[in-house]
Design a protein with these regions (language model features):
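Nucleotide-sugar donor phosphate/pyrophosphate-binding loop at the beta->alpha transition
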Residues: 95-97, 106-125
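Donor nucleotide-sugar binding/catalytic pocket of nucleotide-sugar-dependent glycosyltransferases
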Residues: 121-167, 173
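Short alpha-helical donor nucleotide-sugar binding micro-motif in glycosyltransferases
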Residues: 127, 235-240, 321
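Conserved donor-binding/catalytic core segment of Leloir-type glycosyltransferases
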Residues: 168-206
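Nucleotide-activated donor-binding/catalytic signature segment of Leloir-type glycosyltransferases, i.e.
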Residues: 213-231
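Aromatic "clamp/platform" in nucleotide-sugar-dependent glycosyltransferases that forms part
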Residues: 248
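Short hydrophobic beta-strand element within catalytic cores of glycosyltransferases
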Residues: 265-268, 278
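A charged, aromatic-enriched C-terminal amphipathic alpha-helix characteristic of glycosyltransferases
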Residues: 298-339
Length: 347
């Protein structure tokens, strides 16, 4: 069972990761139940209406966990549903694992004057009760360990290289070179830095979010196309000459792998997430000057980008997830990890 506050129709790396993991676990022979806000009464998050927040979910959460009786329970998010599942597990003496997907302390600080130490204390409390906390990169693992987090293990991310693959540059009729941004358009994503950087060609923004209207008005020369999905997203991405990843707060950045799978190099700041994903000078460029990184990335070999992505399929990511659950079993965790005879992913 996977419990998550982030699920469809949200569009973000957490949802993609969990959906792909659930699907691949099903292919490996497990019955998977995803418990998401879809199954509860919800209200829209005041600052981000696309996010639905469950209302008083504890009783229904307890009922669903008890009815499914999972051999392994993974709490993927620290939201209302994650807290309800955590509370039930602790009350019933059930072991569980968690994962650290989002740098909430930095996100919160970008929106309100909340000190980092307070946010990290809350996250230590949440994850500290789990048997393992799954983290996507070595850099974030070290940062969390330095802040007192325990039982941290690696769970890398993946990319669908059948959907994301090189395509015709002619798909986009824009002046070259084309620098693309892909993702939510929100203050914590630092999209304004990308839009403000000097660039001789075109800027393409693929995505949507609460900051879109303001940024689109401020940067009329940029092309905003909204969210794109599947092969349509891949076609837009493959037609770009470089993808720019301006975020300073992501734990990984799935779009980096998606760009590489399309043969498109990435320009990013040298911070946690990109440091672990981008091979500087081979699949992208890391630089404190984002425009300089983007210009240098234009000279990189698309074949090297594609080769990096081919080593990071979702099957590999899910096998690592499975192995971490199995390692808990070897350390005498009370629940067991074993395949069910049927495959069912709901939520």
């Amino acid at each position: 069972m996977i419990v998550t506050d982030a699920w469809f129709p949200q569009t973000n790396g957490v949802v993609t990761t969990l959906a792909q993991t659930a699907a691949w676990l099903g292919r490996f022979g497990y019955e998977v139940r995803v418990v998401s806000p879809r199954e509860f009464r919800t209200f829209p998050c005041p600052t981000y209406p696309e996010i639905r927040v469950a209302v008083f979910p504890y009783r229904e959460m307890a009922r669903r966990i008890a009815a499914f009786n999972p051999h392994a329970l993974h709490i993927a998010t620290e939201g209302v549903l994650g807290c309800a599942a955590r509370r039930y597990c602790l009350s019933e003496g059930l072991r569980f694992t968690t994962s650290y997907h989002t740098q909430f302390p930095q996100y919160l600080r970008s929106r309100a004057p909340i000190p980092l130490w307070a946010s990290y204390r809350a996250l230590r409390w949440f994850h500290g009760a789990g048997e393992r906390c799954f983290v996507s990169t070595s850099t974030v693992t070290r940062e969390l360990a330095a802040r007192g987090f325990r039982h941290l293990v690696r769970w890398q991310r993946g990319v669908d290289t059948e959907v994301f693959q090189p395509g015709p540059k002619e798909f986009l009729d824009l002046p070259r070179p084309i620098a693309a941004y892909v993702g939510r358009i929100a203050v914590e994503k630092n999209v304004g830095t990308f839009l403000a950087m000097p660039w001789a060609g075109s800027k393409l923004v693929i995505g949507d979010g609460p900051a879109r209207a303001e940024l689109e008005a401020q940067h009329p020369a940029a092309r905003f196309v909204g969210f794109r999905f599947g092969s349509d997203l891949a076609s837009h991405l493959a037609a770009a000459d470089v993808m720019v990843f301006p975020s300073l707060t992501d734990t990984f950045g799935l779009v980096n792998l998606e760009a590489m799978a399309c043969g498109v190099p990435v320009a990013a700041f040298p911070v946690a997430g990109p440091i672990d994903v981008i091979d500087d000078g081979v699949t992208g460029v890391l630089d404190v000057d984002l425009a300089r990184a983007a210009r240098r990335a234009l000279d990189l070999n698309p074949a090297d980008c594609r080769a990096r992505a081919l080593r990071s399929g979702w099957d590999v990511s899910t096998r690592e997830f499975e192995a971490q659950l199995a390692s808990c079993q070897r350390h005498e965790v009370s629940w067991r990890v074993r395949p069910h005879p049927a495959v069912s992913a709901t939520g």
